[in-house]
């Protein structure tokens, strides 16, 4: 079952009478399965934050539909079931952390005892117990980030949306947040997050979406993703016609124009069928090399192929 199902969603911002409209999301379709960790990555301006606002119901799509747990988003009680950490959380800095969490508990209709117990557990996990009586204005960027995560999780939501959760964190803070996300996953919660730290996405996610220019250009289940990283063979070939390009892509290779020919990127497991096709088609190979491809490499390659 999908917690979120987006079908052909588009959103355009119209900044003013004399300014050009900006299409932030363009024909976006994605499926966030229940109990999974979904990582959405893309360059600045790709449409990730707009996608999150659409998921939260903070803005309405111009076209398309968004379902939450099988219901249209506008008909669901999404706010009570989601915990949200924005990229730059604004917290009432005159409050202490304990006061902030008490306020969150009241707005979430939690009892005083549940608020206290839940707050103590979260602060302990994120190493904030000793500073809970300090005003938030005295917190560092990393401490505020961890405080924002406590705020987002206090009401024990079934779905957690995190926009750049590792932002401003030192290595120890990143480890604490990483472990907490793993724990939430083990509890069966659905987690959707955007991050520029691709190593964390690579290690955490069951599903990964690559976004550029408002479009979802690639989407992987973890098993498929693992088949696309690791050792990759790069073949520089002569010019390929459209039919040859389609055949190579169907065999698991990706293609881009380079120099006087094309550059093929082929995951190690797909090398032999692609190479056999090249031989059968008498396609000239001009050069060959192999590299270890990470998610970062795959991301950069996909953005280039999508036309950025």
Region roles according to the model:
Residues 64-80:
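Conserved ABC transporter NBD signature motif
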Residues 160-164:
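Catalytic Walker B motif of ABC-type/P-loop ATPase nucleotide-binding domains
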Residues 231-305:
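Short, charged/small-residue-rich alpha-helical element at the C-terminal edge
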Residues 43-47:
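Walker A (P-loop) phosphate-binding loop of ABC-type ATPase nucleotide-binding domains
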Residues 178-265:
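ABC transporter nucleotide-binding domain
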